[in-house]
Structures are given as structure tokens and as C-alpha cells.
């Protein structure tokens, strides 16, 4: 039996720095625009597994991790099935099977928008960051297509 092991996973549990209301994840750039590291196998395992669960606290200090738009897309939302936070669980609407199964499970199910609203209520919506035109990193998908780029953050002076 040949092929990538990630394509044979039933479940994968991943962490993230940010997730947006489209279930896109960012594991490379902090909410302050600082390059944190590489994406590793995050997008590969998310795409390959039958069910991708991403865990994150709702807030990192006073910074919301659930937001309208991630700083950088490293894992596309169509490959993410469930977001688990300390304030509730959001299931991607494309996974009706999971939504139906969760109805009678007595779990704190919320929409991703509800989680974002809770985060913005507990800590203000972050101001948009400003970037230069200079690209400092390229985010590629499994097939080598460019998903996003990381630009140099403008000085805070």
C-alpha cells in the first residue's frame, strides 16, 4: 500500500495561531505580523485526513485568535472540519454529518461567527496591520500552487 500516510488518517488534531470565519488557519505569522516559523505538515494533514480538528484558545492574551480574516492563509478552510476553543466548538457547515451528530451530544456547539463575536467582545477587534510590498515568504499548497504570501511588516514608528 503506497501513498502519503496523511491520506490514510481518520482524524488529525492540529493547533493554530489564528482561524477566520471561513475556517482558514494561519500557523506561520503572529497576529502582530511576525514570522513565527514554518507550516510543517499542517496543510497536508488537514487535506489528507478524513476529519481535521483544530484547537486554539479563543484569545492569546488580549488578542482574538478567531477573527474575520487570518493574517496569512496556511491551511485552507475547506480542509478544516472542526474548531475547538475554550469557549465552544465550531463545525464547518460543509460537514453536515458532524453537525447532525453533535446535535444530541450536549457539546457547546457554536457557529464560527459566534466564537468570533465572543472573542471581539472579550478583546477588541484587532486593527489591520500595515505591510510593505516586499514578500518575505511564500505559502504553497500540497500541489505547489501559491496560497498566500507573507509581506514585510511596516515599521511601527
Enumerate the language-model features and the residues they cover.
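Conserved phosphate- and dinucleotide-binding cores of soluble alpha/beta proteins
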Residues: 1-157
Amino acid at each position: 500500500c503506497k501513498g502519503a500516510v496523511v491520506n490514510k488518517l481518520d482524524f488529525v488534531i492540529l493547533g493554530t495561531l489564528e482561524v477566520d470565519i471561513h475556517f482558514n488557519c494561519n500557523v506561520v505569522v503572529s497576529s502582530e505580523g511576525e514570522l513565527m516559523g514554518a507550516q510543517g505538515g499542517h496543510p497536508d494533514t488537514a487535506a489528507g485526513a478524513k476529519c481535521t480538528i483544530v484547537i486554539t484558545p479563543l484569545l492569546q492574551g488580549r488578542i482574538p485568535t478567531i477573527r474575520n480574516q487570518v493574517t496569512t492563509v496556511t491551511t485552507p478552510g475547506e480542509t478544516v472540519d472542526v474548531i475547538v476553543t475554550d469557549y465552544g466548538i465550531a463545525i464547518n457547515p460543509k460537514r453536515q454529518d458532524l453537525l447532525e451528530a453533535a446535535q444530541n451530544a450536549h457539546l457547546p456547539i457554536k457557529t464560527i461567527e459566534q466564537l468570533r463575536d465572543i472573542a471581539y467582545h472579550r478583546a477588541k477587534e484587532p486593527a489591520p496591520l500595515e505591510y510593505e510590498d516586499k514578500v518575505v515568504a511564500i505559502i504553497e499548497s500540497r500541489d505547489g500552487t501559491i496560497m498566500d504570501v507573507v509581506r514585510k511588516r511596516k515599521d511601527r514608528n
